[in-house]
Amino acid sequence: MELEKEMKYWKWTKQIRRISGILLLMLSVCALSRQTAFAEENQEVVDIPGLVYDHSMELVYAEEFSVDYYKEGYALIRIHQGEETFLVVPEGKEVPDNLDSNITVLQQPINHIYLVATSAMDLFRAIDGIDSIRLSGTKEDGWYIPEAKEAMENGAMLYAGKYSAPDYEEILSEQCDLAIESTMIYHNPEVKEKLEQLGIPVLVERSSYESHPLGRTEWMKLYAVLLGKEEAAETAFEEQAEKLEALSSEENTGKTVAFFYINSTGAVNVRKSHDYVSKMIELAGGVYVPEDAGSDDNALSTMNMQMEEFYAKAKNADYLIYNSAIDGELESID
């Protein structure tokens, strides 16, 4: 069958690995020239009793968070236009009186983090902050980042359960001072509520909602605020900016690329055309297909297609990249 022959072609070649390498490089690239004055344009400065506003963090691409700095080292983090708000209090400083009940206090040092949002680990690595992560929501064999695997091997980082089933006893015994979750936690709101009842602040990171891949990378600046590593984050950001500048002179190859996986129902899950993966392909000099994927306005970054429709739109793609990170590798066409 022609379909079977085409599916066999999906066993990736050296060319696939080459373009995948380019895409991985783009994951860590973080700068161009566009400025996003998120805090200044979209939100007013919060008046906190006893604190004096100083300045706001300058962000290049990230649109899902903002940081306002106050005198004496205080910092206010707002996520998703203030849906979640955190006040980072420097070590040795007092929590302001009469603080709004919607503001969660994060007292530095923050060095017993329960990291459930796996995508954040590489950003912590970039700012030399993995030592501040005591608990992991991913087992040792699930990490591809050497520093994370090593930390779990030597006991510096412990497994404390996945997002839907955390080990509360372990989390409490390790004096966890912050849980960083992905938006998957909203599927189990009782877990977030329980952690907060136990006195553990929960920060839900939304880097996956950034429309530009560089916006995702810029979340390292938020984590740097937690750890007091802003200079390290700025340095890492600038280093990646130089890499992008070198790549920006490359001409568009015109090569078409499909990025997908087959879900448990047999449907093909693809990235929408506005998603960060689609943007990475564009930045790497390619053209994402299907080009018309996801013209609707909902916030989801992926969509499902029937196999026949996907085949019709992607059969002539120059490169087919299978996303095995979700449901594993494709072993057969059955």
Language-model features, listed with the residues they occupy:
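A short, structured surface patch at a secondary-structure boundary
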Residues: 75-172, 178-184
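Flexible, glycine-rich surface segments
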Residues: 249-333
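N-terminal secretory signal peptides that target proteins for export/translocation
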Residues: 1-15
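Sec-dependent N-terminal signal peptides of Gram-positive bacterial secreted proteins and lipoproteins
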Residues: 16-38
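Extracytoplasmic substrate-binding proteins
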Residues: 156, 169, 173, 177-267, ...
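Short, structured coil segments at secondary-structure junctions
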Residues: 129, 198-199, 284
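Bacterial Sec-exported substrate-binding components of ABC uptake systems
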Residues: 34-121, 232-259
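Extracytoplasmic/secreted envelope proteins and their assembly/folding machinery
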Residues: 107-110, 118-125, 168, 188-192, ...
